[in-house]
Amino acid sequence: MRETLTNLNSIIPTAGNATRLYPHTLFQQKAMLPMGSPDKRVVDSAIDIAQQTNETYMTLHWDEEYTKPLLGHIATRNSEITTFRDRHIMGAASLIEFSDELFENDIEKDTIILPADHIIEGLDVEDFYLTHKNLGNDVTILLVPPKDYGQYVGVSENTAVDISTDRSSFTLSSSGIYIIRNKAMLEWAAMEKKQGWAGEIRSMLQDFITPNVYKGQASVYKLHESGYWDDVGTLRRYYLNNMRLSGGENVIDNNVELSANAKIRRSIVLGGVAVTDLYRIDKEIVSQNDNILYRTRIEL
């Protein structure tokens, strides 16, 4: 680890239900879906970045059975990750629930929030962190070239001055990746508790990031033009990013029963599926639970 990053921790939230990827995440967690090959998982991009930081924490889905594959995968990555399990779907309220453990002991440090379903390449974590420290605000937002979804950020010099879903006025997108002062997170958690928070769901964007933008406390950092970022939490984007990484080849997960004459083209077949000679699979995401086969055709 670079000495600069000894004061930077990381959090990987993995506790959501991933409803945008239904039905394929009904029985397997989004973080554990293959990404580009059967040896890579969606969450690996976040873990790769987190391994450059001092301490890594992960919030887990409340269902212990659902998270067993993820915990097993972490063990194979030789990653020292401390986990915290949500008691129900909480969103960013996990950071309130576990604020003492996540931030109290490292109050003078900072934390990078790394969503488990984001693919990111070419991020200079050290430069991102140094920019955050030099600008001195509570939050620094990682910006990327404009996407056709999500939040767009208005910028003046190195400060975010507006954030909106309206693309017409802005030329940069928020990646949903942030570096945050631990002290600011503790203050937010304390305020929520004082106002009567009792476990209700919270949004990192709406309840923490956006208020900081309008208080003038959000800096920005632009991903290098040679970098790459995408949120793979929808069926279409999950499919397209797999095809990008596989060079257009099929992504056949582990534990797939594949007959010798199966006809599969530019598709993703998730673990547990038995593909016989009768199937013709073309530009699809396919999963199976018990005897129910789920097929999603992606229109390009």
PLM regions: where:
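Conserved N-terminal catalytic core of the sugar/cofactor nucleotidyltransferase
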Residues: 1-15, 20-26, 34-116, 120-121, ...
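Catalytic-core segments of class I nucleotidyltransferases/pyrophosphorylases
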Residues: 112, 120, 126-133, 146-147, ...
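Short beta-strand segments
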Residues: 57-59, 141-143, 222
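Short beta-strand-to-loop element that shapes/binds the nucleotide-sugar donor at the catalytic cleft/hinge
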Residues: 139-153, 169
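Structural signal for interior beta-strand "rungs" in well-ordered beta-sheet cores
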Residues: 250-300
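Short beta-strand-to-turn element immediately C-terminal to the catalytic PLP-Schiff-base lysine
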Residues: 143-144, 153-156, 179-180, 286-287
